[in-house]
Each structure stands twice: as C-alpha cells, then as structure tokens.
C-alpha cells in the first residue's frame, strides 16, 4: 500500500541517510512525494543489496562512516540528514556500554555529517533505552550536542505497532531537529 501526498512544491527536499539498513525509513519519506534520497550510507553488504532494490536511483555509499566526508555527498544542498546509528551500545539486548562501546561513537560521526552539511532538519531513530542509558547522561549528551549545533529538537518514544500495518511490537525513540534559522 502506497500513501502519497500531492505537493505544491516543484522541488523536493534532499535527504542524506546514514546507517540506512534496507532503506525502510527513507521509503516512508519518499512516499510523501516531498523528499528525495540523494545519498545513502550503509556498511553492511547484505543490507546494501536490499537497499539497492528498494532505492535504485539513490547513490549508495558502502564505506565505513569514519571514512566519509560531508563533501562526498553528491548534492548541492542537503535539506535533511537522517540516521539510525547502530543501537547495540544502548540496547538492553546488548552490553549497554554506550559511548564506551566500539559502536558508541557512531552518533558523533553522524553529528560530524550534520555539522558539515548543515541541513535544515535532522531525523534520528534508536532504541528507547538510549533515553535512560547511563542514568540519562547518554541522551543528555546527544541533546546538548544537537542544541549546540543550533537545532531545536523534539523527541518521542513510539511503538511501530500503533502506526499503520507494521508487523512488530517495538518501541523506538525518534528525534526531530530543525535548524533554528529555518524555524518560523
């Protein structure tokens, strides 16, 4: 089932997506007909194979995000940066080492892309446990980093089963940030 919204805009918003997996979140944005994914980064080769099937027109970069520079994104402008950095460092299913985990620095790599591209909006998703991890300090660091980069942020924990025909019962945190200069 595809839901689409007709747009009065002649130009779509450009998205650069990181930790893209198979591209499910991007698909939702594209189905609004308001957004176009101009760049995606995914390190896992099997996820990339599926991503290419779901998004054949998107430039897909398979490098480790540590090796990617903001200027590598093939677009004049990036309106939205989105990412769901790996959650094992914060998940109750993992060891919960947070920023001390080898994967825990990946938020800061996403932040590096945000700082370099200066998008008008950001969209981040992760496990709900990130909010309370390390007595809330992990989430505080993330909120402060985004706020210091001039983003007005709102966040909410949502369960996919409550929104449409999604076959999972899993709570996730969603963070939306708008560049303060873009907010009217």
Regions found by a protein language model. Give the residues of each.
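Short, conserved SAM-binding/catalytic segment
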Residues: 49-60
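Class I S-adenosyl-L-methionine
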Residues: 70-78, 88-184
């Amino acid at each position: 089932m595809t839901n689409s919204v007709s747009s009065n805009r002649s130009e779509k918003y450009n998205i650069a997506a990181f930790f893209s997996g198979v591209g499910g979140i991007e698909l939702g944005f594209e189905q609004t007909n308001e957004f176009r994914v101009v760049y995606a980064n995914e390190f896992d080769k099997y996820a990339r194979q599926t991503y290419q099937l779901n998004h054949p027109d998107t430039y897909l970069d398979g490098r480790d995000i540590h090796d990617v520079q903001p200027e590598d994104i093939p677009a004049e402008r990036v309106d939205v940066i989105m990412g769901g950095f790996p959650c094992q460092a914060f998940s109750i299913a993992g060891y919960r080492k947070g920023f001390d985990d080898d994967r825990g620095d990946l938020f800061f790599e996403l932040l590096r892309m945000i700082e370099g591209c200066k998008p008008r909006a950001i969209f981040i998703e992760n496990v709900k446990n990130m909010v309370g991890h390390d007595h809330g300090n992990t989430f505080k660091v993330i909120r402060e980093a985004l706020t210091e980069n001039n983003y007005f942020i709102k966040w909410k924990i949502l369960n996919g089963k409550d929104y449409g025909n999604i076959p999972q019962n899993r709570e996730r945190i969603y963070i939306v940030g708008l560049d303060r200069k873009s907010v009217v």
